[in-house]
Each structure stands twice: as structure tokens, then as C-alpha cells.
Amino acid sequence: MTPANDGGHRYGATALTAAAIFAFMLALNHWMPLHRDDYDYMMVWKTGVPIASLSDVLSSAMQHYLLHGGRMVTVFCLDLFLWLGKPLFDAANALMFLALSVLVMMHARRSAALTRTPGLLALAALLLWLSLPHFGEVAVWKSGSTVYLWSAVPAFLFLLPYNLALKVMGEGQRARHAWAILPMFLLGVLAGWSIENLAVTVTLLAFGCTLYARRHGAFAPWMLTGAVGALAGLIGLVAAPGNYVRYDAQGADKGILIHLGNQIAGQGEMLLYLLPVLLLIYTAYRLCQRRLSGLPVEVHGSLFLYVGKKHVVAFDKGGITTVSVALWSLLLLLTASYFTGGWVASAIRDAVIAGVLTPLGQTRPKTIFLFTNVMNGFEEMAIYWLAILLCYHRMKELLGLTTASVRAAAQQVSWREVLRACPAARYAACLIGLGLCNNLVMIAAPTFPGRATFSSAAMFVAALLALLNDPSVRSEFFLPACRLLREAAFLLLAYTGAAALLLTHEMGTEDAARIAQIEAARARGETVVHFPRIENTRRALRHVYYEDWDNGVTRDGAMEYFGLTEIEVPPHRPQ
């Protein structure tokens, strides 16, 4: 294939990949109904008046800024697109996820080229799909996606020129670009006026990169204007009067131990969602360590010898191990339970309530409801983790990463030597550290829900992609292991994607029936509606986000928006 034909092929493959990502996300967004906070934001904030014009959008954003919080940019976008209509919002939200996938790929490659690595773009989208905590809440639900997804896109876009400038600086080049002075300032304002932890990280990074460039004689004016813009946005974010109103209500009486506990819980939840990413990063690190050690590799009787930069391969017998048998047994048990009523999760739930919560006196109805809600998703999450661990166990066998070989390589090559010898590993380590520090900023917040780790999880994904983009690292993944990873990726996407589409469609149909019932009731002059409870609580590993109408936020907002006096839903009945 000639270079021209190869370029055309990659362009077509990239366009096809992007179209597939957009179409999938558009379908999810189309079937996801408006609910919960969406109704509050369809009205001018705290007035009960539906938004009917652009001036109402601006007025609502200002009211929110004064009374609730500083995220004025994201609130403006949310109010604007809710006013413009759901179809346009669906398309814009799908486009934002595609943009984030592209930006994560570009940061991983440290290149703004779009069409050279369609496979890396597909992998970026897949890993974001699997690894972003509470995906349905932060990337599909409108009120959540505008806060997290729509904040991450301008922030990652803003940081890309700094990243590229640092790269060319290391190659002895300079990135002046005088035309970028004003655009970078404006983009900096958007990036800084986003969400609290990401805004702080972006501002510090911008000033840090600017100072580093100045000390190395590669300073460009756009670096400083961008940093100043980010600082201006950050000030606008944190100085909002509404922040102090909300903090007084949520966190004024919370001590440092509560903040530390929130930090541990938030970081821990993120790492659980990042399990496939972390295992692949660890595998890449061990492969680099083994390559640098020069040790021969044995894979079930197959001898791999490092000869220069090539591998000499014999044969592979394969085999069944105790670990794989244990993992398969647990997987089959949980799968059988999942499709026959969830009796394993129910047994664990009842045992914890009887043996832990009851002796501690934690048996309030809300506590039991919240714990039951967690256990409703236990089996599908456990099945997901076990499938990943099985894949990881088999991949180690195919790559010859036995305990003995890993220990032998570690004795000869330290982690410091790996970082010195592998630029991709150094860059990935920086991204991982950046993600952890980005979360650490939230120690000042009264709460730290798992969804707030959104941008940090994206940084971890970029770290893995940076490793896999490096030819010296990628070559360590032998062909059978690559085939296994492709098959596993396809199965995980097919399972989670199909489940998310089906469940979202089901929730959308149920919600549409309720809206029709409300409209019929209002046409008859009635102000009270009765809904049956939606019994299906499965959420496809949190890729679907929907709360029934007995939730106070949904009920109160919908009553005000539709002019109702009461919405009645039967109480929850634990299975």
C-alpha cells in the first residue's frame, strides 16, 4: 500500500470509528429521559417559571450563581440546551463524548493528528466507557454530563497546547503562535470556570508549564494569557456567593476526618472502576521491566529469548490452573444467580443487615434502602470484575509473566530504571500522579462522590494509551495476548453496551408513559397522579442512570414544572 493509499485508509477508518462512537452515544442520549434535576433546570432557578427565551437562560444562570454554586458556565450550557430542546441536546452530548475520546487520544500520543491511529481512538472511547465512574450519570444524564463531561472537554482542549509545547521543547523546538494569545485566554476562562478540582489542576498546570518554558527559554505569550484566563475562570468559580450558601448547608459541621474519609472512599471507588486500565498499566510496566532485564521468557514450555529487539519463539502448551478454576467457578455461580433472581446478592445483603447493621443500630429505612440499592448492582459488578480477572490471568500466561519471572526481572531492573529507560513510562507516571492529585483537591469539599473522579479517571486512561502507543511497549504484547485483549474488549462492549441500550430504552418508555399520564391528568384539571413503581433496578454497571419518581428531587421538580400538587409512587419493597 502506498503512503497516499495508507493515509486515505486511515482517514476512512478514523471517520468510521468516530461515526460509530457518535451513533452509539446518540442512541443512549435519545432514549435517556429527562428526570431528576433536569426539571429544576428547565425553569428559571428558584422561580418556578419555565425557561422561554435566551434572557431567561441568562437570568437562571445568574440566579444559580448567586444562590447555589459557581458553575455558571456549565449551568448556562444546561439551561440553554434544555430550552433548545432534547434532540439537539442529545446530539451535542454525544458529540462531547466523542470530543473527549479524541482529546484523550491526542494527549496520549502528544500529537494533534487525528487520523493516524483509529485503533487508539476506538480504544480511548472503550476505556472511557468502561472506566468513568457512574457513566450514565456523568456522560448521558443531561444535568450530570454538563457538569462533568462538558467541563472535561474544554479543560483537556486547553491543556493540549501546553502538552504539545512541552514535547517540542524537549526536541529543541519552540511553539510561539502569536495568533493564539486571545483564544488561549478565552479557552482558559472556560477551562478554569468548570468544576472545582479540575479547575484548580488546570490553573496550576498552566502556570507550571509557563514557568517551566520561561526557565528553558521557550516561553510564548499565549502560555501566560492562557494561565491568566484559567485563573480568572477559577476565581469566578470559587468566588460565587452560592458556594458559601451551599457549603453552610452541606459541610460546615464536618471535621477533617470526614474529609479524609471522603477522599479514601472517592479514590477507592475510582480505582475499582479503573480495574482493567490499572491491570494493563501494571502489565505494561512488568513487560518493560522484563525487556530491560534481558531474561529469557518461558510460557508453559514455550521459550522466548530476547535476541536484540526480536523474540525467538518455540511452542505453547497452555493449561488450567487453580486460580482460573476458582475464578470460573465464582463467575458461573454469580451468573446463575444474576439470571435467577439474584439470590447470592440477597443472601449477602441479609447477612450483612443481620450480622453488621443490626448490631450497630443502623437499621433506619433509608439506610436499609441505600444498602439494598448498592447490593442490587453487586452481582453484575462482581461478574464484570471476575471476567476481567480471568482475562488478566490468561494474558499473564500468554505473556509468560509468572511469579518467578516477574521477581527475577524486578531484582535486576528497578522501577527507577524503567522510568529512565522508557519515556512513555515516565509520561504515563506523570499522568497517573496528576490524576491522583486532581482528586486530592477535593479534600476541601464537604462531599466527594465517585462521579467527581471523572477527569482523574480520564487521565488514567490517557496514561494507559500513552504506554500502548509506544512501539517498544506495544511490541511486548505478543500476538496471542493481543488477540485475547481484542476478543475481551469486544465481549465487554457487547455485554455492557447492549445492556445499557436495552435498559435505557426501557426506562425511556416507562418515563414517556408517565409524562403522557401527567399531560392527560392536567388536561382533565387534575393535579395528583399515581404511578406504579418501576421494578427493574438493574443499571448495567451504572451505565444507566434513572431514579424513580418517588425520589424527592424528581418529584418536587416535576410537580413544580407540570403544576402538580402530588406525585404518588408505591413504597420500595426489598426483594
Features from the language model and the residues they span:
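Cytosolic-side transmembrane helix boundary signature
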Residues: 406, 457-486
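Transmembrane alpha-helical segments
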Residues: 97-108, 154-166, 203-211, 276-287, ...
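Transmembrane catalytic cores of multi-pass membrane glycosyltransferases
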Residues: 27-87, 91, 142, 194-410, ...
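Membrane-interface alpha helices of multi-pass inner-membrane proteins
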Residues: 177-196
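Alpha-helical transmembrane segments
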Residues: 10-24, 119-126, 182-186, 225-233, ...
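Membrane-interface transmembrane helices that cradle and orient dolichyl/undecaprenyl
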Residues: 155-179, 215-218
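Membrane-interface micro-motifs in multi-pass membrane enzymes
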Residues: 118-166, 194-195, 373-391, 436-467
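Intrinsically disordered, polar/acidic, low-complexity terminal segments
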Residues: 3-68, 82-102, 107-119, 397-417, ...
